């Protein structure tokens, strides 16, 4: 392993001991924000410390195996010759696992996020597919122990959604969902199709990390046009009796955000402002990414409708993830929320790209 990486790891081990000592200080739990930050850092460092211990053990095993090759005993030499390939591959695996842990982390990966799904080409069928996608993500959120709640929606005329925006709260939400942004295409026979012909429809998905209040872009109140209106849809007796729903227009960019999820106008306004802040921050991040002119492919999509990332082919039960040339014939399970079979390979490919970039620059 590169000596500079070893030095970095030794520094992290020292930091692990420092954090452990700080967590043992009397009264540390009285400052909840500091305590949570230290606990989170300790858990991350603990994983690296254990991985480094496994790497050192693999190094020792390889050295011991090489020494056995020099033994006088022919049986020992033969045994060492058999064990050598496994000892080498184990060390390589442990080294790669450590390198992945040392990759620069996106600080937003631990954030909650907003999930936006919009029907595109395909009319009613596109809206129905948007509903299917929302159900898929809702099932996935349940599996992960996350909480998903609708912020605003515009129902389709024959089911599904013309547009739905949801908030997803939980552990590592953005880090796992960020690869979902882009164009999703469906190929299937609509229920209304009497001739049995396969139609193609599309939806766009955008995943935006929630911006913590302390980091939110400053928005000038004079740049906002705020309208109130009566909520529509499910909600019992309260519906359409008060103007609790909020529509905020950001005049410089033309961005419009609506929220009618809460009965309180104040809460709806706070939610809408949070979505607006996330969209403005995402637009700013996208400008920075474009300015970097990176030669590496960007697996994290922008949510642009022209950026087709995935095709769902119902007649063949096939899902095609175009960015990494992944084809899976388990569409039924995926639509029921079994998304890890796509998300995990995407993360691995993303990490491989990062490792390749580090190797080029080292």
From Swiss-Prot:
Compartments it resides in: Cytoplasm
GO molecular function, one term: translation release factor activity, codon specific
Signal peptide boundaries: none
Modified residues (N5-methylglutamine): 237
Keyword terms of this UniProt record: Cytoplasm, Methylation, Protein biosynthesis
Name of this protein: Peptide chain release factor 1
GO cellular component terms attached to this protein's record: cytoplasm
Family: Belongs to the prokaryotic/mitochondrial release factor family.
Role played: Peptide chain release factor 1 directs the termination of translation in response to the peptide chain termination codons UAG and UAA.
PTM annotation, UniProt: Methylated by PrmC. Methylation increases the termination efficiency of RF1.
Organism in which the protein naturally occurs: Aeromonas salmonicida (strain A449)
Alphabetical list of Pfam families matching this protein: PCRF, RF-1
């Amino acid at each position: 392993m590169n000596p500079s990486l070893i030095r970095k790891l030794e520094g992290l081990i020292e930091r692990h001991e420092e954090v452990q000592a700080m967590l043992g200080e009397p009264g540390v739990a009285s400052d909840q924000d500091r305590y949570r930050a230290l606990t989170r850092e300790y858990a991350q460092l603990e994983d690296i410390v254990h991985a480094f211990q496994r790497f050192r053990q693999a190094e020792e095993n390889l050295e011991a195996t090489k020494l056995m090759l020099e033994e006088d005993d022919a049986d020992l030499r033969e045994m060492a010759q058999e064990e050598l390939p496994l000892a080498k591959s184990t060390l390589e695996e442990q080294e790669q696992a450590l390198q992945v842990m040392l990759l620069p982390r996106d600080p937003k990966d631990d954030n909650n996020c907003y999930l936006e799904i919009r029907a595109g080409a395909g009319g009613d069928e596109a809206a129905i597919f948007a509903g299917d996608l929302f159900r898929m993500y809702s099932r996935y959120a349940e599996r992960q122990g996350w909480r998903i709640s609708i912020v605003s929606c515009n129902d389709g005329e024959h089911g599904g959604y013309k547009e739905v925006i949801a908030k997803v709260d939980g552990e590592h939400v953005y880090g796992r969902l960020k690869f979902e942004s882009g164009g999703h295409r469906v190929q299937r026979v609509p229920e209304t199709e009497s001739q049995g012909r396969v139609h193609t429809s599309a939806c766009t998905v955008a995943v935006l990390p929630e911006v913590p209040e302390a980091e939110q872009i400053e928005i000038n109140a004079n740049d906002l046009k705020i309208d109130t209106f009566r909520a529509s849809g499910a909600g019992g007796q309260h519906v359409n009796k008060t103007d609790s729903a909020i529509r905020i227009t950001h005049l410089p960019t033309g961005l419009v955000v609506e929220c009618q999820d809460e009965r309180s106008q104040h809460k709806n306004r706070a939610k809408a402002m949070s979505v607006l802040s996330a969209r403005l921050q995402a637009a700013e991040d996208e400008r920075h990414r474009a300015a970097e002119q990176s030669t590496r492919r960007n697996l994290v999509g922008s949510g642009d409708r022209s950026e087709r990332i995935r095709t769902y082919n119902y007649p063949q039960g096939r899902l095609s993830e175009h960015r990494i040339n992944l084809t899976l014939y388990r569409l039924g399970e995926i639509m029921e929320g079994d998304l890890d079979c796509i998300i995990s390979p995407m993360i691995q490919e993303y990490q491989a790209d990062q490792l390749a970039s580090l190797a080029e620059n080292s």
